[in-house]
Every structure is written in C-alpha cells, then in structure tokens.
C-alpha cells in the first residue's frame, strides 16, 4: 500500500476517576485548548489543530493562507518564537491542509517500532 502522506495525531482525554471541581477544571482546560490560541501557536510550527477554524482568529490572513490554505506567503512567516520560517513567495511543502490530509492513504495509530522504543526508553530511565 503506497503511503500518500505521513501525519501525527494527538488528543486530550479525561480520567474516569475525576469528579467535582477536578472534572470541571479538566473540561475548562480542554475547552480553552480547543478555543483557538493553542491551535494558532501549533499551526505556526507546521502542525494542525483539531479545530482549525478557531485558530484562524489567532493568526494573520497571511499565516492562515500559508499554513492552512497552501498559499504563497505575502511576507515573512515567523515561528511562535519569532524565527523566520519562510519568506515572501514561498509555499508550504505539501500544499493546503486538504491536499495534505487528502493524501493520507493508510493511518496507523501506533508505529511498528513503538514497543521497541518503549522498552529502550524504560531501560534508559532505569539506568
């Protein structure tokens, strides 16, 4: 099976053991996380938010066009820390979000090497 594009995913979950104020705080955190600021920060590093539409208001039109729509940058594209990542006229490798995600052919939830890496990590931290 030919792989069209590789992608990573992440998510947030709530422990079934939470209740009361702790459960309320967990939901408040997740709502904040998905409200846009975090997504805008992540997208400036080349990652995507689970709710990209909320990220748009925390990005300039040029940033949104470059990172999400696959458009050529109109000016410098900066990382969240201010480092220049692309200049005017440059386009993101792989195209728009829809082009990139539309090319995913096979989605694996865990890499083949996962168990090996976990064992090696545990050996490292136990040393």
Predicted region positions:
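Acidic, low-complexity intrinsically disordered regions
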Residues: 4, 28, 60-63, 103, ...
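Mature extracytoplasmic/periplasmic domains
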Residues: 10-93
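Conserved C-terminal helix/tail region of periplasmic/extracytoplasmic solute-binding proteins
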Residues: 81-127
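Short beta-strand->loop
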Residues: 1-6, 17
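Short acidic (Asp/Glu) and glycine-rich catalytic loops that position anionic groups and cofactors
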Residues: 6-9, 97-99
């Amino acid at each position: 099976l030919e792989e069209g594009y590789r992608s990573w995913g992440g998510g947030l979950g709530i422990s079934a053991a939470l209740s009361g104020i702790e459960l309320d705080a967990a939901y408040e955190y997740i709502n904040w996380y998905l409200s846009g600021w975090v997504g805008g920060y992540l997208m400036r590093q080349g990652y995507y938010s689970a709710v990209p539409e909320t990220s748009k208001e925390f990005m300039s039109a040029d940033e949104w066009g470059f990172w999400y729509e696959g458009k050529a940058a109109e000016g410098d594209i900066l990382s969240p820390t201010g480092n220049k990542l692309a200049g005017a006229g440059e386009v993101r490798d792989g195209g728009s979000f829809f082009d990139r995600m539309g090319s995913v052919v096979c989605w694996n939830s865990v890499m083949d090497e996962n168990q090996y890496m976990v064992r090696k990590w545990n050996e490292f931290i136990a040393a």
